[in-house]
Amino acid sequence: PERGLAFDFLADAPAPDGSRGGGAAPATTVALPIGIKVVVAGGFGVGKTTFVSTVSEIEPMSTEELLTEVSAATDRLDGVEDKATTTVAMDFGRITLDPRHVLYLFGTPGQERFSFMWEELSEGALGAVVLADTRRLEASFPAVDFFERRAIGFLVAVNEFDDAHHYRPDEVRAALDLGPEVPVVLCDARVHTSGIEVLISLVHHLIKLRSSHVSEAV
C-alpha cells in the first residue's frame, strides 16, 4: 500500500510536456513514462558516484577524471587521501519504478569549485539525497544549506564506511543542525537494496511534505 501511495504521488509530477500525470491517456496515443528527477549531493568523496552506480538499472554515465597534483592541492582531501578520481560534471543513472514512472538520478560534483553546477543540475528536481560521511560531516553543510534555501525536499543518508565510527541518526541530526522534519537514514552506498531503501524513504518524505502543503492551503 505504501509503495502504491508513493506512485500515486509521483503520478502528479510534471511530465516532460508540462502536463500532469495520473489521468487516462487518450486511446489513440501511447502513454510516455513520466521522468522524476532526484539529485544526489554531498561533499567530496562521500560515495555519490558509488550510490548512483549501485542503484541504476542502466550503465551509469559518469564524468570521473583522475585527480592531478594541481586539483589535489585545490580540493580538500582530508579523510579521502586514497581517492584517485573525482566527478567533474555529474553522474547519471535511471530506475524504472513502474511502466509509467522513471526515476532519473543526477549526482553532483562534490568539490566547492564545481558548486556552480548544482543550480543547473537541481533545476526541476522533485527531491534530493544528501550523502554524508561521519568522518567529515562538515563536508555536508554546503549541500544541506543549498537545498534548504531552495525549499527542495531532501533527506540525509549517512554512508557507513567500514573504518568510520557509527553514530545514531539523532546524533547526526544534531551535528548537522537539521530540523525534525528532515529524515536521517543509514545506508551502505555499495549495496543495491540499501540504496533503494534510501530512495523509498525520500519518496515517503516528499509525500508528507506535499500533504502538509495541501493541508496548509485548505
Pin down the residues of each PLM region.
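Short secondary-structure boundary/capping elements
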Residues: 87, 109-114, 135-139, 167
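Conserved C-terminal guanine-recognition region of P-loop GTPase G domains, centered on the G4
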Residues: 131-181
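Inter-motif core of Ras-like GTPase G domains
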Residues: 111-135, 145-150
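Canonical P-loop GTPase G-domain recognition
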Residues: 162-218
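Conserved G1/Walker A P-loop phosphate-binding module
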Residues: 2-80, 94-98, 102-104
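Conserved beta-strand segments of the P-loop GTPase G domain that flank and frequently precede/overlap
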Residues: 105-108, 128-133, 156-160, 186-188
